[in-house]
Every structure is written in structure tokens, then in C-alpha cells.
């Protein structure tokens, strides 16, 4: 590998001097070659130990130089921007070469982890494309795409295989873990050696956590890790059989993660932490998974979300799935110890309104179908080696400095929200469940300009003394406390869901309107763009995840009025992660149920009743054809209390019982939830 690396670096040095490629392409190749030479300089600083001796100011300069083409200040005239690349390099070639540069830019992270094979592979990709331009003044786009195709196909058994191993094997996914456990976290220079861009959010988060007492850090970490443990207990799964917890989190929260790792060790769990993917081979479309930075240029990420379109065909799908199966099979003993993810989410970032650029790579309709099929098969394959009925998860969220001047106060309020008395909520929510269990269906309506008008069918109970429809959800897998939820009966569930403003997976939606018939989406729109076609495409890509329709997988009533009151006090309702937002009103999830891949595991509420509403008429198809049962997505859409008219449960005999009216809880025993609202 060292010889290949040296040859590649020598070639980069030659490219920046040569004139064998015609303009405007020559300048592009020389620019990318210079970037790779910067990676070589970074490599020398890392390997020699020089980077550890650099001042924070020097580290910031090094970082800004490496990330210059991604930063908003420079992005408009960057080859990483497909719009600029097309302007300078022309049509298809511009989009293609922008995607190639983006693929190579992952090298910053690879050098920090000293995964030099990845850097070599990227440099050799550039050389092969460069050679094509030396042979022909302007090569045909198809011949260039073929080079990229075989790059992705050939090295799938490197990138995709390593991705799986980094997830399940703590000896592999250990770079971030070692940084957390071995570095002096009070010296913020460590951040610059983690391989992601360090902005205000990352630095100020770490600095603020350093100012907190160990007792406060322990409280946050204990809530997080204990939620994970209780998730196994409440679902009757044996945590003692497991050995690996996969931690996802945003850079800056290392002090909390360090304590959480110590807590997990007491449960017999070793941590694995992989970083968010920087390669088209392993990158998802809609969210960052793993260890990620907060302050990066989101438009850059959005512009390249469909770069997989350069290679997506049936043969590539089969190749990737083959690599996945081979990797799991070769590591099945290690995979058996995988317990599931523990996730720290964040909220408070500035609103990102994506610009849909025609110059960016787009998936064709056929490719969208292939992607949906691949994700479905990938999910089933993963479940084969990491069975859903044996693993669990937990997820918690905290704010980041970008939320505003009252960041410290909001952070303290969030700690309170995340540590509310679950026993109080458990009792109140049981009162609500007792009323809901008597219903045949529930009516949910909006107030004022909110057009929501939904009828939600409920599962019938064969034995009400031993069975229940709704889960009494307190603070285990979903922190904070505060919801009761069910999997609706699809048949007969119909109407309109409307929200004036909501953020889903970091993207805003204005006047989101979704219509349902027989529990499945039939129509959808929003007012984000002037063009109705763009609005529909935006929802199709980011909520339906390229499925022609999705069912309602969950109906829930959020009860965390404290979180709602905090949102009103600080005007941050639009900043909440869905994890908290879903607790601040009724919500509906489109996609899979909350019990996907574990429907046959019996689960019980604290009162001992079995929750029987774990399936619907689509998920039950898993017994005949799993490909028809799952969608690999679950998106919660919340109606805030101030847009809510009423929630009424209707019994078979027509008797109506109001749960909420005009944003206030009405059932005797639930009035305490109104106190924060008052």
C-alpha cells in the first residue's frame, strides 16, 4: 500500500505541472490534485506527532484550509458545488466531476484515522479519470461514468465491508472511542484531530460541558445509559447475551459519551463508534448516522445525496448485497453480540432550507425503485444477522449553541425534561390508556387554520382484562417521557393530516398536508416551493423515501407538556428534534410500526397487560413475504397542542370520550398535564 500511495502522490505533483489536459478541465484536475497533496501534508503532521503539538490557532488554520471548498463562504465558487462545476465544466461532465471531488474529499477523515488505503483508492480514481482526459480532449460522459461505476463496484468489498465491521466490532470501530477515553477533554485541541469540521457548535458544546460539574455530567450520562438498559428489561430481551453497544453522537459531546461508555462497561458492553459516511458506497440519503459534525455546510451534503445515481443499477445492487452477506457471514459470531444503537441527537441548529439544484445528480424513476428494493433487502439481511427481536436502542437529545443566546438556560431545561419523574407520567398515561382501550376508533381534529381531520381505527381487544391497545411509554428507549402509542388498524383509517410548520430529519415543511385512505397515503403537498411539482418531489424523497405510498405505522398522544411549555418560553418549538417534539402533541408516523422486526415478541405495560397492537395488515405479510412487510423508514409528524382541536375516542356503541379539547387534557386524573400549559 505504501508503494501505491507514493506513486499516487508523485502523480499528483506531476498533474499540477502538466498541460496535457485541455482547459477548463486542467484547472479542475490541478485543484483536486492540490487537495490530495494537502492530505499528504496532513498525513505527515499526524504520523510525526506534529499535529498534537500545534496550537489551537494553527489547528484552526489547517482545518479551514482543508475544508475551504465545503464552507459556505467559498461554496458558490467551489468544484464541490455541482452548480459551479456545471457552470465551469459544462453539463453532465460538471455534475460528474463534482461528485468525484466530493468522493475524494472524504480523505480528510481517512487520514486522521490513518486509513490510507481509502486515500489511495480515491487518488487512483482521479488518476484514471485524468488519463481519460489526456487521451481524449473531451471524453464521453458514459465512458467516465463507467470508471466511477467500477470504482464503486470493485471497492464495495472495502468500504461497505468495513462499514459493517466498524458497527459490530469494538476492535474495529475504536478510533473515536480511543480519542474519547485517552485524550484530555479539557484541552479542546483534541476536537481538531477527530476528522470532522469543527465549528462554533462543536467547540462551544465541548467548552460548555467542560464547565459543568461531574455530578451533572453523570446525571445526563446515567439517564442515557439507563434508558438503554431499561429498554431491554421492558421488552423482555436478554442484555446479558450482548457485548457491543453502537454509539451515535455529534462531535462536542465527548464528556457525556465518556461517562456513558463507563456505564455501559458495567453492563458488560464495549462501545463501537463509526463516523458518518463520506463515500457514495455507504452514504445514506436522508440523515447522518454515527459520529458526525454539526456545523458543516448542509447544502453541500444535500447537493450530493443522490450521487449514488452515477452507479445505481441492478448489478450494483446485487454486488453490494453480496458484500454485505459475505461480511456478516464471516463475522457472525461478533454480530451475535451486537446489542443495538445508543443515540445522542441534537437540536437548535439554524433552519436549513435546501435549494434543489438541477445540476446535482438525480436518481431516475427506475433507480428510485432499485434503491427502495435495495434498502428493503438490506434491512432484511441485517435483521438476519442482527435480529430485531434480540436488540434494542435508546435515543436522547440535547441543544447546541446555535440555538441562541439562552443556550445555557435551554440546556438546563432540557436536562430537566430528560429526567422528569416517569412514575408520575406512567400513572397519568395509564388513565388515558384505560379510556382509549374502550374505543373502536379515535377522531383527531385541528383548530383554526389546521385542516387535520382523521379517523384512526383501533385494534379490538379479545380480553380487556389482560390486553391493551396502547403502550405506556416512559423514559427508556425514547427519552424524554411522555406518550402513549399504538399501531392503528389500517382498514378504515382515513382523513387528512395537516401541520403548519414541522421539521423532519432536519428539513422544514410548511403547510404539510397528507391524505390517507385505508391507512395509506394517497395525496400530499406542502408550500416550501413555488412549484407544486417540487413540493411533491420534496415529500416523496424525504418523507416517503421514494415509496409510492406508506401506511400509518403509529398513532400516539404526546403528554410532555413541560417540554411544550419550554418550547413556548424560549420560542424553540421549530428547533426541537422529533424525539422531543413527538411528546408535545398527538403524532402520526408514516412507515413501519414501532415493533418492526420484533412483532412476535410479547411486550407488556407496567400494569401487566400485553400490548397486542403490534401488527397491521402490511407488517403481517412478513410471514409470507418480508419484502412486502417493511419500508425501512418511520417518520413522526406532530400536531402541536395549539393547533389541536380535539382528540375523541369513540366506542362501538357510539359513546364519545374526549381526551383533549382545545389543547387541554380533560380526563379526570390527567389535568396535571395542563399545569405547564397554563
Segments predicted by a language model, with ranges:
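Active-site bordering "gate/hinge" segments
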Residues: 1-491, 660-678
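Short solvent-exposed loop/turn micro-motifs enriched in small/polar/acidic residues
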Residues: 437, 505-508, 548, 581
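Short acidic, glycine-rich loop/turn motifs
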Residues: 444-450, 501-504, 649-653
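Conserved AWS/pre-SET-to-SET junction and N-terminal core of the SET lysine methyltransferase domain
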Residues: 475-513
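Active-site and channel-lining beta-strand-loop segments
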Residues: 509-526
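Dual-mode signal for accessory low-complexity, basic/Gly-rich regions
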Residues: 523-595, 599
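Glycine-anchored, exposed beta-strand/edge motif detector
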Residues: 584, 590, 599-604, 615-623
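Extended hydrophobic packing segments that form well-structured cores
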Residues: 607-678
